[in-house]
Amino acid sequence: MKVLFATGNIGKYHEAKQILARYGIEVERVDLDYPELQSDSLEEIAAYGARYCAESLGQPVIVEDSGLFIEALNGFPGPYSAYVFDTIGNEGILKLLEGEENRKAEFISVVGYCEPGGRPVTFTGEIRGRIAEEPRGEEGFGYDPIFIPEGEDSTFAELGVEEKCKISHRTKALERFAEWYKNNVAGR
């Protein structure tokens, strides 16, 4: 079984490849630049992206959109996480939280799947945690150096990709997709 993953993010691709391999699903990356829907809903963004890519490629495809929701910042950056990271980075987020005791945060990932002419299906995964006082660790990408998952003392970047892929928001969303895919699409 093989699925196309439309993403320009090589880190996401490697994580998806590792996670979906457990289900016997091979992942092929397609670097398709598609317009991102401006919405406060990760589900809407992922569904739109999946439909757009499936129609553009003429093949079934998955996309993934994720957001970091920080409680003290009223859920910011949320669905705008990629833009905010590119604009102010981890240092900017830490600056916004300077002096803030409430560092609770949640990472949410939504995987969207669509076939050409079909309706998109979405799968959500989430993980609670907190924002570190400073960036820590070398592995991963994006907000990994500042996000500490609940029950851990290490950031995602300190845990490393293999450990992160056992517990992350993206893992949960991809596992939900994989179960659905095996039961509804594979072998058709």
From Swiss-Prot:
Its EC number is 3.6.1.66. This is dITP/XTP pyrophosphatase. Mg(2+) binds at residues 36, 65. Keywords: Hydrolase, Magnesium, Metal-binding, Nucleotide metabolism, Nucleotide-binding. Its cofactor is Mg(2+). Homodimer. HAMAP family: Non_canon_purine_NTPase. Belongs to the HAM1 NTPase family. SUPFAM superfamilies: ITPase-like. Gene3D superfamilies: 3.90.950.10. The active site is at residue 65. It comes from the Archaea. Binds 1 Mg(2+) ion per subunit. Transmembrane segments: none annotated. Pyrophosphatase that catalyzes the hydrolysis of nucleoside triphosphates to their monophosphate derivatives, with a high preference for the non-canonical purine nucleotides XTP (xanthosine triphosphate), dITP (deoxyinosine triphosphate) and ITP. Seems to function as a house-cleaning enzyme that removes non-canonical purine nucleotides from the nucleotide pool, thus preventing their incorporation into DNA/RNA and avoiding chromosomal lesions. Pfam families: Ham1p_like. CDD domains: HAM1. InterPro entries: dITP/XTP_pyrophosphatase, ITPase-like_fam, RdgB/HAM1. One of its GO terms (cellular component) is cytoplasm. It catalyses: XTP + H2O = XMP + diphosphate + H(+); dITP + H2O = dIMP + diphosphate + H(+); ITP + H2O = IMP + diphosphate + H(+). Substrate binds at residues 7-12, 66, 141-144, 164, 169-170. GO terms for molecular function: dITP diphosphatase activity; ITP diphosphatase activity; metal ion binding; nucleotide binding; ribonucleoside triphosphate phosphatase activity; XTP diphosphatase activity. It comes from Methanopyrus kandleri (strain AV19 / DSM 6324 / JCM 9639 / NBRC 100938). One of its GO terms (biological process) is nucleotide metabolic process.
